[in-house]
């Protein structure tokens, strides 16, 4: 898991530099490509769909979505029941505040993100003009936490960003980045450029007293629940796809005739070569007459169904 760091001695929450934030965003985009692969697998966009074969060869691409099964099951066990809070003191006001903040929904989203990405981010804020807090899950594809470079790895600030949509492609890429420090919130408009950019946006105090984003890890290394099983998932998809391919190849087997020509004495079968006419007649009549010293058989690929089934079950067991 990549950890974003910033020199502690250079950090000033009242002097956030756009060039630094842009550099961090570009690094996160690289990290996010690996995270996106995990979401692709969860959604069924898996490697088997990119497989290519020679023209004419069966190329079924079956996705047996074990990734989704694993994450949905793990999330149900982990956060299927809402989180409960107990205290010797009266915390009814706190529970009411958490309910109003949408904590249960955020917990569910966080649990699924932890299972898929190995990471989750939760943003706590007050809506404009209101005092009640709101909990919102932020996508790890567009969110990261930055720590200082000390041994304690203290949280300095969190960044949530997105690319400003411009379908004309006539202007340089721009990012809208929300930077959340211990005391302030910045909303920065950053151009994807090597030119220096001055931070003209004024920070707004958020009154939380700490970075209002919680960063969670599924485990110490931030590994998702099915991440290490991806090679096995690919192997399972390949086996199931090849199984269907072999069945199709069996149906499309080549007819081999020894000691005779299929096109002998074929007439009135329309256009085409003698062999093509013979094949039309054979398909229609389902009957083949051959001399005594000749024979016919289908050339088929030997398919060890029992062996493949044993391998399939072994891989499936390893996945789970």
State each model region's role.
Residues 1-135:
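Extended, helix-rich architectural segments
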Residues 201-320:
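Extended, charged amphipathic alpha-helical segments
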Residues 109-111, 121-223:
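Extended, regular secondary-structure scaffolds
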Residues 102, 107, 121, 142-148, ...:
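Solvent-exposed, flexible loop/coil residues
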Residues 11-14, 21, 25, 39-42, ...:
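Extended hydrophobic/Leu-rich segments
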Residues 49, 76, 160, 179, ...:
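Short stretches within intrinsically disordered, low-complexity N-terminal or propeptide regions
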Residues 1-36, 188-222, 236:
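N-terminal start-of-domain structural block
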Residues 116-119, 153-156, 251, 284:
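Short, well-ordered loop/turn elements at secondary-structure boundaries
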